Regions:
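N-terminal subdomain of nucleotide-sugar transferases
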Residues: 1-71, 94-96
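Short, flexible loop segments at the rims of nucleotide/cofactor-binding pockets, characterized by
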Residues: 11-13, 75-82, 135-141
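Alpha-helical structural signal in soluble globular domains
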Residues: 24-28, 117-121, 156
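An amphipathic, basic-hydrophobic alpha-helix
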Residues: 63-103, 108-120, 144-152
Length: 165
């Protein structure tokens, strides 16, 4: 019997449309999944800044898979480049002897810190994000910066995961 792949997934917070995917992955016999959330604000009613309305999910967002909410400093109710200021992932990666770190996104400080820590520990790193390279026209300076940014990202990542089919 093949050993299970020990997969750690780092994501900002429980996301409604990801819950079925995470339950499905957790049901795979060859995968041992643990999800690490940087915040739990979406488990309660919260004001969505993009919609300007309160959101409260009526489905379980964390049922059916192993998960942990990382400790954080300061406010955890919003997501930005610096927030939530979560910590403790490195210790958890070491303790559980993971094989792979899957990171949802690449545009927050904890994404980069997690990827660097995983590479130092010899883990494979996978990235899945909801971004596209099709966007508004950019000036040459911004285009150049993005080109270098993604070259650097590729050095830290072993594979990119697509969203959709």
């Amino acid at each position: 019997m093949e050993p299970k792949i020990r997969l750690a997934y780092l994501v900002t917070h429980p996301i409604q449309y990801q819950a079925p995917l995470l339950r499905r992955i957790a049901s795979e016999p060859g995968i041992d999944l643990t999800v690490f959330f940087c915040s739990d604000f979406s488990l309660r009613s919260y004001l969505d800044p993009d919609f300007g309305k309160p959101i409260a999910w009526d489905i379980p967002l964390t049922g059916g898979y192993r998960h942990e909410i990382l400790p954080a400093l300061g406010r955890r109710d919003r997501v930005s480049f610096w927030r939530p200021f979560s910590y403790g992932l490195a210790r958890r990666l070491n303790r559980a002897n993971f094989d792979v770190l899957w990171v949802h996104g690449y545009n927050r400080w904890f994404h980069w810190r997690a990827m660097a820590g995983a590479k130092i520990r010899g883990l494979k790193v996978l990235v899945r994000d909801e971004a596209t390279n099709i966007s508004a026209p950019r000036n040459r300076l911004k285009q150049s910066f993005k080109r270098w940014f993604f070259l650097g990202l590729r050095q830290c990542v072993d594979g990119f995961l697509a969203i959709g089919t």
